């Protein structure tokens, strides 16, 4: 699991994805994990993601303790995303986050230039019971 904004250059990100893809399941948030957290809130794509698309994608540092995305999450939730104190507030919103994620980019290569996440896809895969396929 990693954040796309860990790579400054698009080419470095794509090179990493090409190397890692193999049999692994790559879980990516673009620009960062705070996007996934924001998706736990009602109408998050329309209220928070779309209006802030460019600023979110760039995700620049806006203070000594926040990037744009972490500050946005803090404003929405009243919690610092690095503290973990938000977990109980968000755990009931996982299904909402999964559904909202589906309107964003889920292709990990396209996330080099688009806002997206495939965390929900991983959760859905983890929820599947392999015995159902027998």
Locate the predicted segments by residue.
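C-terminal accessory helical subdomains adjacent to catalytic cores in phosphodiester-
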Residues: 4-134
